């Protein structure tokens, strides 16, 4: 059984059966009992890009379908959580470092996993404290040159962000020099 939204069969509001019906410019899942429309929206992911001189902090995924692949430290926004608070929380969980979350560097739709569509927001970050150590979803963390990111990359959108940074389309700030 798939948990992707188009495969939902029952209404989360009342338990009634869902049917696909035209609504606006597309087909939508509509409850046959309470008539609620189930809007299928992507999850929001956040990432913090931290620079040390000409290097970026990366983390290697320790499990799941992207095990062994590298990514900019990232995670999901919880219900009711501010995106910057989520970015700082996820960064701390994955790297052991507290960060000041700054400006938005990039926003991309992530279609690489059809089971879990997301919109990602990449923020500039500055390390404020802590000890660099892999945690949560990562088994290794380290700084790599912007010109030579680690391979393989878990998420193709991280490559887009790196390309934007290389071209100067996104500005970024530095980590504290002592970190």
Model-derived regions: residue spans:
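Conserved acetyl-CoA binding element of GNAT-fold acetyltransferases
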Residues: 69-75
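N-terminal leader/linker segments that precede catalytic domains of diphosphate-processing enzymes
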Residues: 1-65, 76-93, 97-107, 111-129, ...
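A short local loop/turn or secondary-structure capping micro-motif enriched for an aromatic residue
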Residues: 65-68, 142-143
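Short, glycine/charged-enriched secondary-structure capping and boundary segments
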Residues: 63, 72, 117-120, 138, ...
């Amino acid at each position: 059984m798939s948990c992707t939204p188009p495969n939902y069969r029952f209404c989360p509001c009342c338990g009634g059966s869902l049917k696909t019906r035209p609504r606006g410019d597309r087909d939508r899942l509509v409850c046959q009992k309470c008539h609620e429309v189930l809007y299928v929206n992507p999850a929001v992911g956040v990432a913090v890009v931290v620079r040390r001189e000409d290097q970026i902090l990366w983390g290697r995924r320790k499990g799941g379908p992207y095990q062994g692949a590298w990514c900019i430290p990232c995670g999901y926004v919880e219900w009711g959580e501010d995106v910057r608070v989520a970015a700082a929380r996820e960064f701390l969980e994955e790297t052991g470092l507290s960060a000041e979350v700054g400006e938005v560097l990039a926003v991309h739709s992530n279609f690489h996993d059809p089971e879990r569509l997301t919109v990602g927001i990449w923020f500039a970050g500055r390390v404020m404290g802590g000890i660099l150590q892999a945690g949560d979803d990562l088994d290794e963390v380290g700084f790599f040159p912007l010109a030579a990111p680690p391979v393989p990359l878990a998420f193709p959108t991280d490559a887009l962000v790196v390309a934007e940074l290389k071209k100067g389309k996104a500005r970024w700030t530095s980590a504290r020099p002592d970190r």
